[in-house]
Amino acid sequence: MGADVTLADIARLCDAFYIGGTKVGAFCGEAVVFTKPGLDDHFFTLMKKRGALLAKGRFLGLQFDVLFGQEDGELRYQRIGRHAVELAQRIAEGFRAKGYELAIDSPTNQQFVILD
């Protein structure tokens, strides 16, 4: 269950996209990815001008440097994400075993338990 779209597919099909970090343990933030040279020419200036650039943004960006590193032949980001999904599925199974209903059958690390 889940999507069969790879990161390479997204990069091939999009001019720009973002990758969130909090669900894989990052303190906060998203990494914005531009797939073609020149698309990011004024991005930094626009972010700064609109007040969306954090003073410690470089420090926060280091999280992604670590998350996008290799560990045992795969991206650390993917390994952590897969582990989070596996644990969420176990939590969902535990709720079902106790008689709770889930709003949807989620293939992600977000589970929506009905607590009525």
Model regions and ranges:
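Active-site C-terminal subdomain of aminotransferase-like
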Residues: 2-108, 115
